[in-house]
């Protein structure tokens, strides 16, 4: 079952508790997040409410049901200064509100649960929705030359591959 904010507001602890009391889970995948990196700088409390408090609400309910929690996180928990890809053993050092609040959410999971997976993705793309690849293809169809940043290192993540990993 896939839920939207209309189905479940993860920032509402009572709503989360009621939802979990009405459903039984072996696994719970959280894709909900405040993801507008730039806007988060001016909406700190909203970003924290969704990315940290909401995650805590879900983690507590997963703990009550002994359900394995799968959290979709981000490479923004790192400072981006490494010249090589990050690994799960690298120490987080977020440099913006988005990264800080996603790290806070990860911390809530780690302190609450024994059964969890945190999947840190970056540059997510697919044939659906809005993403960098689709934007570049669209703009490239209209222009003979594209100006894009070239000082970032990342690992594009195909959404279907990520979904397959989660299902395994």
Regions found by a protein language model. Name each.
Residues 3, 28-32, 69-74, 79, ...:
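SDR active-site strand-loop-helix element
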Residues 10-13, 34, 52, 91, ...:
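Structural motif corresponding to alpha-helix initiation and N-cap regions
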Residues 64-68:
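A short helix->loop->beta-strand "cap" motif at the edges of active sites that frequently abuts
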Residues 1-8:
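A short beta-strand-loop structural module common to alpha/beta enzyme folds
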Residues 10-50, 63:
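NAD(P)H-binding glycine-rich loop region in Rossmannoid oxidoreductase-like domains
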Residues 42, 49, 54-57, 77-119, ...:
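Catalytic helix-loop patch of NAD(P)-dependent Rossmann-fold dehydrogenases
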Residues 15, 57-61, 108, 161:
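Conserved mid-core alpha-helix of short-chain dehydrogenase/reductase
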Residues 107-167:
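NAD(P)-dependent short-chain dehydrogenase/reductase
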